[in-house]
Amino acid sequence: MSFSNREQGHAKERLLPTAKDIDALVRAEHHDPFSILGPHGDGAGGQFIRAYLPGALSVSVVDKNSGEELGPLEATETPGLFVGHFEGSRPYLLRTRWAGGEQVAEDPYSFGQLLGEMDLYLFAEGNHRDLSSCLGAQLKTVDGVDGVRFAVWAPNARRVSVVGDFNVWDGRRHPMRLRHPSGVWELFIPRLQAGELYKYEILGAHGILPLKADPMALATSLPPDTASKVASPLQIDWQDQDWMSGRRERQQHNAPLSIYELHAGSWQCELDDLGEVARQYTWPELAERLIPYVKELGFTHIELMPIMEHPFGGSWGYQLLSQFAPSARYGTPEQFGEFVNACHQAGIGVILDWVPAHFPTDTHGLAQFDGTALYEYGNPLEGFHQDWDTLIYNLGRTEVHGYMLASALHWLKHFHIDGLRVDAVASMLYRDYSRKAGEWVPNRHGGRENLEAIDFLRHLNDVVALEAPGALVIAEESTAWPGVSQSTQQGGLGFAYKWNMGWMHDSLHYIQQDPVYRAHHHNELSFGLVYAWSERFILPISHDEVVHGKHSLIDKMPGDRWQKFANLRAYLSFMWTHPGKKLLFMGCEFGQWREWNHDQQLDWYLLQYSEHKGVQKLVSDLNRLYREEPALHEQDDAPQGFQWLIGDDAINSVYAWLRWSKDGTPVLVVANFTPVPRQSYRVGVPFAGRWKELLNSDADTYAGSNYGNGGGAFTEEVASHGQALSLELNLPPLAVLILKPEV
């Protein structure tokens, strides 16, 4: 193969692109760079080679197999455009000389189409289950060459380029190929490696857009930087086979589920000499500290507030832009995977908060991604969320539907996540959510329901059940939408659980009343049992209840210091014995006084005080009882698992009920929500003999007054509360007793 710098009979106009093509190339407006760059046959067995490398001093062609230099490409009148004609057609390298050195690599424009037709078809259909291995930046070997395959969806763009340090962020250097009709742009850049930072430069209908981060990025730079990062394939030595194989049974509805909700960046932090936060812990550091703590307290699961990358820390992760990348704040994707691995080996499940409802308007993100409303609705009456100043995903678009579905599966399958708590479901279900008349667009039937979001949620739950057996999908849903946790086959949304926001609001409103007024609010604490079996519920005391002036959980409690702690212990005991799975936000388990602040760690120093240590001990004992006593968890979603004994003693603010296991073993719960000890208070029970006191929230081990029944009581043949037998109990002030018949 020899270089022909006089074209040897080939017309010079065939060597050069047309003036129109050159102009579009220089202006970075060419929609099809592969049509003019790279190798092109001359019809006689030879090839034209063209390269556009603005800033290059010279370019020559090297035989890839022999290393022989075949000759230079001619510099043209257009700076940066180099052309040449070669006889024969063999693989080649480009040797490019820059002001700062020399580079030898394959020509990105010498490679054929990259993505398979089936991948593109499934993506367009919204049904690609492993999109995180298809789009985005993927380390690949193409035609024996290692490098990175970039692929991004931008169907309305006129041109898309990959930019990064590797091309000095010059959008003219690596324009991409459009794959019709999917709207996906692709390019393979040889010899690029993991760790490279990159973005996309997109030319929209009205000009160049702000540089965009990759919607499919698997890793990111550390905020406030906003670049995406080329990630290596996950290399995690999974040692959680026992956990994963037993997960379906462990997460059945009749199993205990006690969730510790936390914010990874503010649970514990490294402090400086002044006690201020010096830095947030990484996943390995958190694993070392958090896992033993959660294990000791007896929670079955942790729930992490969103750990996907988000630009603004003050959003707590709920305004995220990287649906596939763990935040760089806490380490690498591999470190997060190892954190999950360690949790599973310790017998702790991991649930992630996941946000498919909305996304922030940051210009480097999804907003107007290709110059049009691509991921969001175009009409602000549909696409703008007034409460949060965010944009709403257009889940009616198949590609967006599939994008969010793939995100869910990415966490569940690649990171072995045990469940997703879907944020803000109510805002997804209703088109008029938080909107006044005239501020929303009805659905195609004229109604207020968001039919696209409903279809998405049902599809999500069906797909998760198929692709990640045993994984939980939990709805934070605050309205009375029917059938949230009913199967899709029965017309429901198909969630495993729904947060019981009604119970949370009513019970907190009750417990904040001065005990002297609680008689007038007696039904607030019992009303939850009217609808307790309409859904499968989780009882949530979440981060939302301890911020924005709502006070911490203990600071909501009325009375002096002693009464506040007694009320808190009674409330937690009530919660743990009430039908429904449990969720408690970090800090509540030891009675942190101040509201949660995402910029500070929890007030761990409080544990030097007996009252705080007592609350922590109580939570540990409640979790142990909850796990050990089938009556407290087996029939959470069945009316036969609960029986009122006393629900109408408003004057004394006393409640009593039985929880039943499937084999007919009861647990008795008696609650006194006044500071007045009740001596010889009679409670009807179904079985004769001694009833053992399993827990007294007023015990001295919890820093209570230790008023009680000496560890148990014997029944008397005195009928009471519809039972032939009864117990005469001493009810401690602001406390809950849990008893069980001795066998």
Swiss-Prot record:
Pfam families noted in UniProt: Alpha-amylase, Alpha-amylase_C, CBM_48, GlgB_N
UniProt keyword Metal-binding, yes or no: no
Gene Ontology biological process terms in this record: glycogen biosynthetic process
Entry's Gene Ontology cellular component terms: cytosol
EC category: transferase
UniProt-recorded Gene Ontology molecular function terms: 1,4-alpha-glucan branching enzyme activity; cation binding; hydrolase activity, hydrolyzing O-glycosyl compounds
Pathway in which the depicted protein is active: Glycan biosynthesis; glycogen biosynthesis
Reactions catalysed according to its record: Transfers a segment of a (1->4)-alpha-D-glucan chain to a primary hydroxy group in a similar glucan chain
Active site, renumbered: D423 (nucleophile), E476 (proton donor)
Keywords: Carbohydrate metabolism, Glycogen biosynthesis, Glycogen metabolism, Glycosyltransferase, Transferase
EC numbers, comma separated: 2.4.1.18
InterPro entries registered for this protein in UniProt: A-amylase/branching_C (IPR006048), Branching_enzy (IPR037439), GlgB (IPR006407), GlgB_N (IPR054169), GlgB_N_E_set_prok (IPR044143), Glyco_hydro_13_cat_dom (IPR006047), Glyco_hydro_13_N (IPR004193), Glyco_hydro_b (IPR013780)
UniProt subunit comment: Monomer.
Family classification: Belongs to the glycosyl hydrolase 13 family. GlgB subfamily.
Function: Catalyzes the formation of the alpha-1,6-glucosidic linkages in glycogen by scission of a 1,4-alpha-linked oligosaccharide from growing alpha-1,4-glucan chains and the subsequent attachment of the oligosaccharide to the alpha-1,6 position.
Name the record gives this protein: 1,4-alpha-glucan branching enzyme GlgB
Native source organism of the sequence: Pseudomonas fluorescens (strain Pf0-1)
Lineage, top ranks: Bacteria, Pseudomonadati, Pseudomonadota, Gammaproteobacteria, Pseudomonadales
